[in-house]
Amino acid sequence: MKLTTVLIVAVLVLAACQFTVTDNSGDDTENPSLRSAGENQNPDSTKTITARATRARTNMRRGLSRPSKGCIGGGDPCEFHRGYTCCSEHCIIWVCA
């Protein structure tokens, strides 16, 4: 029982850390939270992002996805512990922001 509680707390702490990590470069133009609210209200955009992320994930597994800039674009899958591989340096729930 105690082990389960400790594991749950550890997972919650790691998840919270993922959301609190910020880019300290001083350039706020890349920050997705500063975009206008109307930009994300299209219901089709979720399907497009999901399809693109699925396609990119499949290509990454096959070794076909090689970003030209040396970083992963927004909406593409990433590894949360390697957020620096995203162009925005923000990997939220395994997707580059």
Swiss-Prot record:
Cellular component, GO, one term: extracellular region
Disulfide bonding pattern of the chain: C71-C87, C78-C91, C86-C96
Keyword Secreted in record: yes
Signal peptide: 1-22
Polar residues bias spans: 31-45
Major site of localization recorded for this protein: secreted
Subcellular location: Secreted
Domain of life: Eukaryota
Tissue: Expressed by the venom duct.
Domain remark from Swiss-Prot or TrEMBL: The presence of a 'disulfide through disulfide knot' structurally defines this protein as a knottin. The cysteine framework is VI/VII (C-C-CC-C-C).
Similarity comment: family membership: Belongs to the conotoxin O1 superfamily.
Entry protein name: Conotoxin Cal6.1e
